Regions:
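Cofactor-centric catalytic regions
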Residues: 1-46, 50-69, 83-178
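Short acidic capping loops at alpha-helix termini that bridge into adjacent secondary structure
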Residues: 73-78
Length: 178
């Protein structure tokens, strides 16, 4: 119907065979790794990942993934340049294929960290009680609006110090060697 109504513009279907894909198509070679380090004094994060930033936005994307998974502001996340003394050699970055690999590695690492920190927080709540947790700045409820920002919620501890729940939890986790 569109083609009959338009003399010069036409719609059609095209099939294009592709001989060469992107990447190696060998799982062994298409891997990435990430290390996430928490600074216990302020809760800031340093992400080491093997991808090389060559203008494709890898560092920004990995930073966004880490912030989203951990539920903390991007300003608290710092990206480290690729360094083989921390992370093994990555897959190639050609055609921006290294970016999704590196971001997936960051995602999985941050998910593991989030799980460990959450388990630690719930263990504190169970073992120490609600009052102890609230006094130490681990309070998951925002009383002002009834909604929280997760770990980015700013709370006061028993000394009226303001900090994010994330900062309080990571400090306690470091103290307890979690």
């Amino acid at each position: 119907d569109f083609n009959r109504k338009n003399k010069w513009r036409k719609r059609g279907i095209s099939l294009i065979p592709v001989k060469y894909g992107s990447g190696y198509n060998i799982v062994l070679l298409e891997q990435a790794a990430a290390v996430v380090v928490v600074n216990p004094s302020d809760g800031s994060i340093i992400i080491h990942q093997g991808g090389v930033e060559i203008g494709q936005g890898l560092a920004t994307q990995a930073q966004q993934v880490g912030a989203y998974v951990l539920g903390i502001p991007m300003e608290m996340i710092y990206m480290s340049n690729a360094n083989t003394s921390v992370i093994p050699n990555p897959t190639s970055t050609g055609g921006s294929t290294g970016t999704p690999y590196a971001c997936e590695a960051v995602k999985q690492t941050c998910e593991q960290m989030r799980s460990r920190i959450m388990d630690f927080g719930y263990k504190l709540l169970k073992d120490k009680g609600e009052k102890w947790c609230k006094d130490h700045g681990i309070d998951f409820w925002n009383y002002g609006t009834g909604e929280g920002k997760g770990w980015a919620t700013v709370v006061k501890d028993s000394n009226c110090n303001e900090a994010m729940i994330w900062q309080n939890l990571t400090n306690l986790a470091a103290t307890n060697r979690i």
